[in-house]
Amino acid sequence: YDSSNPVKPKIINDFSKIEPYSFPHSYSELPNGNILTTFQTKKGLKTVGGIVELDFKGEYLRASDAQPLDETIFMRPYGIVLIPEHNRIVTTNYDMHETDNGYHIQIWNMESLELLSTIKLPHVNGMINDQNPFEGRLLTDGKTVMFQTFSCGLFVLDGVETLNPNITKVFNFADKPFCSVPVRLKNYWIQTVASDSGGFNGLVVLDISNPYNPVETYRLNTGEDIGPHWLSPNVSGEKIVMTGFFKE
């Protein structure tokens, strides 16, 4: 889209796949003005996709496969976090077709698009919060990434600029509901939580001044008819738009 007039955006290109990659999901503008895209698959639901760099008109420039060396690892590139100060990209791992669950994230070299690491989330016995790393956000230090799983765990990734990146679980929003698209505003994390089985629906606000010890500061219950899914702030951060599902 040409969004120079956001009220009347114009389509300048469209695609459902860019051979051999298929099922694009997330888009993020690189420091050079190009667009980075995650493609979940290649030529079928059982294939692993990759990341693709496009120019501002959506034309293919280059790409890199997300297939780990260990081919038993389930990988479907999903969300994108750019870490320009350290030449890194982080992608999460959630299958929109729900053919299986992801338990790993990936770290890439931003300049070359080389896949550097595929890292498994730490598991907590008796819980499933390590399933399906969903959306990540870069923290204020410019190098630490916080991300949540669709299964409502919250994790911190540090050391992306080193040879030994590390993931730490720091919070659990709920046991069974779904945790979708969050917002980070300065040192606050605002998380959507939705349940289709009678659990909590609403927003949870955390003070993440210490990202390894988040403190819940507020919880908004949206009721059984509204399951929050997606959040986006305005430029000033004074207002947040929320979408959701359940009752029409």
Regions found by a protein language model. Name each.
Residues 1-248:
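Feature marking well-ordered beta-strand scaffolds used for ligand recognition
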